[in-house]
Structures are given as C-alpha cells and as structure tokens.
C-alpha cells in the first residue's frame, strides 16, 4: 500500500510542477485540489489497512568518489497526513487568492510562488536525508522572502522580508552544524543512520534547536513572524498555517527520538517553548492590528507545539496540533483579509465593530476559528490542545513551566475574545465605504470548507495521531478539565483587558501595556538601540581613530609635517649673509682637516 502511496504522491507533485508553468491561473489550483483528494483517499485506505511501516524511495543522484548523494523520500504517517492537510489548505488559499488579488496584474506569478512555497514544504516533510531537508528548508525561506515582499513599493513589506531572511539565516547556521557533524561523524546524511546511533553529540542537538528556533520563531528569533503579516493576506495565511513556520516544529518531531534521550536538551527545548507561548500570548493581548493579533497567536501556538515535543515527549500530539492549527489559522487570516479588504484596508480593530451584520458568513467563520483556537470543546483545537494540557500536567520535568503553559492558554482565550468583541461584536465604529459583498464564490467557498474542517477534523485525526505509548493513569477531574477551565478564565480576563484599553490615557503611560504593545521592547532594542550603538562606535573609530587619529598623524599629516620642518630648517639656513657663509665654510674645512690629520 505504501508503495502505491509513494508513487502516486510523487506523481502528483510532478503534475503540480507541470501545471505550475501553465498560463491558466486556475489550472494549478485544480491540480492541487485533485492531488489533495487523491492523497486523502490513499490516507483513508492506509488507515483502514492498519499499516504502520515506512517506505523509503531512493535514487542515486551524484557519486563523488566513494560517496553517493541520494535523493530519498520517507513516507510514514506524518508525511501522509501532512500531504493531505497541506494540499487541502493550499487549494483553499489559492481559490481565496483569486478573489483577494483579483486586481493585481501579476496574480499568475503570485499563484506560482504560492505553489512553489507548497512544493518546497512537501519536499521538506518527505525528506529522508539532511541534504534533501536542506533543499526544502532553503526553498521555503526563499519563497517566503519573495512573497512577503510582494508589494515591493511598501518599505514595511521590504523590511519584513529582510527580517525573515536575516533571522532565518541564524537558524540556518544550526542546520549547517547538523550537516557538517553528520558528514564528519557518519559520512552519511540519512535520518536512518542518525537514529541508529547509540549516542549523538550535544553539538548536533544544539544545531537542531537553533534551526527549529529560527524557522519556527521561538523567543529570541521571533520578531520576523509578526512582521511577516505585511505581505498579502494569502501569503500570511499559507505561511502561518501549513508551511514555513511549522518547519522548525517538524524538524523537532523528526529528531524527537534523539532529543528525548538527552535530558539537558529536552529541558532546554521545554523552557524555550514555554517562554515563547507565554510571551507571544502576552504581546497579543495589547495589539490593535487585526492581522498582528492573529500572527502572535501563531507564535504562541508554535511555542505550545515545541513544548509538547520535548516537555511531554509526545511528538504525535505536536503533529496533531500542526494539522488542526493549519485549518483554523488559515481561516482566521482569510477572514481577517476579507474584513480588511471590505473596510478599505483598515486593520485597526478599534475602528471596526458590528461586522456580524455587514459580513455574517465571514463573521461566523471568524467566530468558529477563534473558538477552535481557544480550544472550545468539540472543535478541532480542543482535540489537540486538551490532550496536550493533560499530558503536560502529568509530566515530571518542571511544575513552574507547566503553570506558565496554563497561563498562556488562558491568555489565548483572552485575546481571542477581545478580538471578537472589537471586530465582530458591538456596533460599527466606522463608516463602511464599500459594501462587503459575500456573493463571491472564491471568498465564501474556501472559508466554509475550512470552517467545516475546523469543526470535524479533530474527530477524524485524533484516532490515528494519538501517542503510541499511553500510560494508564487516573487523572482527577480538576486536571482533566484544566484546559476548559483556563479557557473560561481567559474569557473573563478578556473583559478586563477590554475595559482597561478603553481608558483615556495613553497606553505608553501604563508600563505593563507598554511592554505588551511594544513586544517586550525587543524590536526597539535589537533593531534600533544595538545597531545604533555599533554604528556610533564604528563612526567614532573611523572618524577619531582612523581618519583623524594615529593613522592620520603617522601617514599623511605626519609625513607632511616632517617635510615642513625640514623645509623650514633649510629656509632658515638661507640668510644671505656672506660672512656667515665664509665662517661656516672655514669651520667645516677646519673640521675636515683635523679629522684627516688624526687619521
């Protein structure tokens, strides 16, 4: 069965590449749709046949001396599920792009870039070697730069694209460390060879953590993710849901068997994910840009995924949350884009309100997506977040970090309720200049399909993506209902936050809100203060040490000054006094004569 899956999946990728260069913009979207349908049917057959083995398809690409560079594909449950989710979500985003980018003269090129983005991610997920993973890794990085800077006339878009490249370059150093260590130690880049090792050097695992932190925007390398929403909404929807940002989490999932054998690295990843999910949730509470709130929610959920990979030792649950998160996060960005598009590009939620009457279908989908993000029972987010909270509660790593995860979960509900209150609820706070027409099939169709998925996908995926090793535990009712309880607490916090932000005084006068609104002052420190210090030091060194310092005195000014002194002495000697000249000649002659007599 897996042989058929591998052949047909690779065939579908080849067909998508062919249609990628078609001049008809809808042809590629149709190829993605049918490829997704085919992979979904194959996944259903695979699950019913109860096959759990893996398939490796390998071809020798280049042979250098005694080393062969292989192109190899790894088809397991992770690969099969992600193919279905990625193709399905991307198809809906492509259809939404036909509505959102309808006035863009380069819409054909835009859709091709989205397709290449997807293909690079599928190549990364199906990779069986570090070399092939590097190709997909760099592919999603390059395409993210091209798509975020799509509106190249906007300085903010270009700055955001450069941030994405620079921060991901830091993460790429970790991937290069992995490649070099693997080649020197093993002479092989395959995952199978790494899994077979009895001991893996900590240096290699630090590279894994650095690479994942850069690509999945963990704390310290996170500023590029909120800034990436400067690109078109379809780009944000695809980037935040099922492509680039989950690549780092997927890397941790692939190497989780090795990470879980190193307690120090496991604890490091656990704290990194915990601090990321809490910090991002706190920052989302005080943001007023609709897309930025959704972007920070992505960073918070990525931190939760990283936490469960290492802290709970359950990579299956992290992957389950990746799949569930893809459905409702893509829908949230598309709903936000629909609102912003209808409000003449207004993104400030304080100027919205009453959108449930102007755009009822989009508002309902936005509510479903927010509820799924909060983890409301029986939606997709509940089936992934509730097991995560349960398994983190029973882990024996660190109770302090577990408490922070619960606080972050309550904050998720808080900023989601706040966003719903300001945008969909209440009365309109601005005049809608253009009616929000919901009769476009390319607007409503993708939203409805993703809304259905956000409702029923959890029931489908939970059965075959549950942890393989389940401990027989009897949890008290308080821990069992912890996820639902913190969600309710977050809803209550949201009302206080709404009232707090209705005050007349400036947000910057409230230290707590200033910290949240300014993203912990991290962009101010990293993008302004530190570069300014280094530039001032460079200017001081160049102007005071180099140009006007010892080099100036030793070379240009020094040589000129010495020559001037010599010239002045020569000038002073030319006094035009004949008696002086005769006296000097007599003295010099007498001196020379005396020396000759002595010798």
Curated annotation (Swiss-Prot):
Transmembrane segments: 1-21, 28-48, 81-101, 115-135, 171-191, 193-213, 233-253, 265-285, 302-322, 323-343, 363-383, 398-420, 455-475, 481-501, 510-530, 577-597
UniProt catalytic activity: a ubiquinone + NADH + 5 H(+)(in) = a ubiquinol + NAD(+) + 4 H(+)(out)
Keyword field contains Transmembrane: yes
GO BP term, example: electron transport coupled proton transport
Location of this chain's protein in the cell: Mitochondrion inner membrane
Enzyme class: translocase
Gene Ontology molecular-function annotations: NADH dehydrogenase (ubiquinone) activity
Membrane topology of this protein: Multi-pass membrane protein
Keyword line: Electron transport, Membrane, Mitochondrion, Mitochondrion inner membrane, NAD, Respiratory chain, Translocase, Transmembrane, Transmembrane helix, Transport, Ubiquinone
Cellular compartments per GO CC: mitochondrial inner membrane; respiratory chain complex I
UniProt key word Manganese: no
Function: Core subunit of the mitochondrial membrane respiratory chain NADH dehydrogenase (Complex I) that is believed to belong to the minimal assembly required for catalysis. Complex I functions in the transfer of electrons from NADH to the respiratory chain. The immediate electron acceptor for the enzyme is believed to be ubiquinone.
Entry similarity comment: Belongs to the complex I subunit 5 family.
Name this polypeptide is given: NADH-ubiquinone oxidoreductase chain 5
């Amino acid at each position: 069965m897996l042989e058929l899956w591998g052949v047909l999946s690779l065939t579908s990728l080849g067909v998508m590449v062919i249609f990628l260069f078609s001049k008809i913009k809808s042809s590629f979207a149709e190829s993605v749709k049918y490829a997704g349908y085919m992979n979904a049917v194959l996944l259903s057959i695979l699950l019913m046949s109860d096959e759990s083995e893996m398939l490796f398809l390998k071809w020798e690409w280049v042979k250098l001396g005694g080393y062969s560079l292989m192109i190899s594909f790894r088809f397991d449950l992770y690969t099969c599920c992600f193919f279905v989710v990625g193709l399905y979500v991307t198809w809906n985003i492509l259809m939404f792009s036909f509505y959102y980018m309808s006035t863009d003269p380069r819409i054909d090129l835009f859709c091709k870039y989205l397709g290449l983005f997807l293909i690079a991610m599928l190549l990364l997920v199906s990779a069986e070697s570090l070399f092939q993973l590097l190709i997909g890794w760099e592919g999603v990085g390059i395409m993210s730069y091209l798509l975020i800077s799509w509106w190249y006339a906007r300085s903010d878009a270009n700055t955001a694209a450069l941030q994405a490249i620079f921060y991901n370059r830091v993460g790429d150093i970790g991937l290069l460390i992995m490649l070099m260590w693997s080649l020197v130690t093993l002479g092989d880049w395959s995952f199978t060879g790494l899994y077979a090792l009895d001991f893996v050097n900590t240096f290699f695992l630090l590279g894994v953590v650095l690479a994942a932190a850069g690509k999945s925007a963990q704390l310290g390398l996170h500023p590029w993710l909120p800034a990436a929403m400067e690109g078109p909404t379809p780009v944000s929807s695809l980037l935040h849901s099922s492509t680039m940002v989950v690549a780092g989490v997927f890397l941790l999932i692939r190497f989780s068997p090795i990470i879980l054998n190193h307690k120090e690295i496991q604890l490091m990843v656990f704290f990194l994910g915990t601090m990321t999910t809490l910090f991002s949730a706190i920052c989302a509470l005080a943001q007023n840009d609709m897309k930025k709130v959704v972007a920070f929610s992505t960073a918070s959920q990525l931190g939760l995924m990283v936490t469960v990979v290492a802290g709970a030792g359950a990579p299956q649950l992290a992957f389950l949350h990746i799949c569930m998160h893809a459905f409702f996060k893509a829908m949230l960005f598309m709903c936000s884009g629909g609102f912003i598009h209808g409000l003449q590009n207004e993104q400030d939620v304080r100027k919205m309100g009453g959108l449930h009457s102007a755009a009822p279908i989009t508002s309902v989908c936005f509510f479903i997506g927010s509820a799924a993000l909060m983890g409301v029972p029986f939606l997709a987010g509940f089936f992934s977040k509730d097991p995560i909270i349960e398994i983190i509660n029973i882990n024996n790593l660190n109770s302090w970090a577990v408490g922070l995860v619960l606080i972050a979960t309550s904050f998720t509900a808080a900023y989601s309720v706040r966003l719903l209150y300001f945008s969909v609820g209440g009365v309109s706070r601005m005049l809608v200049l253009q009616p929000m027409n919901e009769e476009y099939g390319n607007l409503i169709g993708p939203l409805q399909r993703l809304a259905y998925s956000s409702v029923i996908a959890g029931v489908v995926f939970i059965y075959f993506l549950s942890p393989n090793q389940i401990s027989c535990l009897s949890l008290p009712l308080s821990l069992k209902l912890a996820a639902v309880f913190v969600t309710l607490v977050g809803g209550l916090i949201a009302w206080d936050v709404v009232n707090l932000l209705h005050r007349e005084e400036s947000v910057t006068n409230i230290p707590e809100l200033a910290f949240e609104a300014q993203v912990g002052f991290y962009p101010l420190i990293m993008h302004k203060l530190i570069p300014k210090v280094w530039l001032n030091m460079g200017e001081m060194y160049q102007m005071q040490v180099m140009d006007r310092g010892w080099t100036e005195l030793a070379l240009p000014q020094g040589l000129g000054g010495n020559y001037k002194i010599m010239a002045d002495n020569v000038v002073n000697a030319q006094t035009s006094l004949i008696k002086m000249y005769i006296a000097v000649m007599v003295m010099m002659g007498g001196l020379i004569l005396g020396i000759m007599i002595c010798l």
